[in-house]
A protein has these predicted regions:
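Short structural boundary motif marking the start of a folded domain
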Residues: 2-7
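Short, hydrophobic beta-strand segments that form beta-sheet elements in well-ordered domains
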Residues: 8, 78, 92, 177-180
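Short polar catalytic/cofactor-binding loops
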Residues: 10-15, 44-46
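Glycine-rich beta-strand-centered segment in the early N-terminal region that forms part
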Residues: 28-46, 54-98
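NAD(P)H dinucleotide-binding glycine-rich loop of Rossmann-like/cofactor-binding domains
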Residues: 70-77, 87-156
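Mid-domain Rossmann-like dinucleotide-binding core that forms the NAD(H)/NADP(H) cofactor-binding site
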Residues: 126-204, 208
Length: 209
């Protein structure tokens, strides 16, 4: 590939994001400067935080401007480097732009050199071994200190962190009940994620349940 494809913001999002809010742009592949390295992005994480960056309103991050490249956590591989700490072939997790190739430097946000385990797909590092999985694991074990035989109730159970929390709790021998916002999500967490039961907070009586 000789060009760098980028997903850019075509218009601000006011409700649920639609395809027309985004556009595809192409440009040259950048060259790393001194202390930088070029990353070939392989996987991106669809983070809830991105929604807050594409509405034109400032929050803890500056909003992405119209025409700006969408950003989010990614996993990629170094293909060219002028940084002694990152060499060609290294796998890297970082907050990058949604593009084929990104320039990174040592002080990039969330930058981490990965040491992939044999047999573990690299995509897991933006999923179950990424932020969502870590949040679920720490919340259950370090904060909740769950024990086998307990009942664990998970809110937002169909989301990234909630679905991971439910599956981890099941593996630990707990009964798991998930709270979701639709019958479709209720069926999903029971049939696909292995929850014992689901509550649709929009239609079910949570107190009675």
């Amino acid at each position: 590939m000789t060009t760098n494809r980028q997903v850019v913001l075509a218009s601000y999002v006011t409700d649920a994001a639609q395809p027309e809010n985004f556009a595809l742009s192409e440009g040259p592949i950048p060259e790393p400067g001194k202390g930088e390295f070029l990353l070939r992005n392989m996987y991106f994480s669809m983070e809830p935080a991105i929604r807050g960056w594409i509405d034109g309103k400032a929050n803890y991050f500056e909003p992405i401007p119209i025409g700006g490249v969408i950003r989010g956590p990614s996993v990629g591989q170094v293909i060219k480097s002028r940084n002694n700490d990152f060499v060609e072939g290294d796998f890297v997790f970082a907050l990058n732009q949604w593009e084929d190739y990104s320039i990174c430097h040592s002080d990039a946000i969330l930058l981490e050199k990965l040491q992939p385990e044999a047999g573990v797909p690299i995509s897991y590092y933006v999923g179950s071994l990424g932020g969502a999985g870590a949040t679920a694991y720490i919340g259950l074990h370090e904060v909740g200190q769950i024990q086998a035989g307990q009942t664990v109730v998970v809110s937002a159970a169909a989301g990234a962190t909630g679905s991971m929390a439910g599956q981890i709790a099941k593996l630990c021998g707990c009964k798991v009940i998930g709270i979701v916002g639709s019958d479709k999500k209720a069926q999903l967490i029971v049939d696909e994620f292995g929850f014992d039961a689901a509550i649709n907070y929009k239609t079910d009586d949570i107190t009675a349940a």
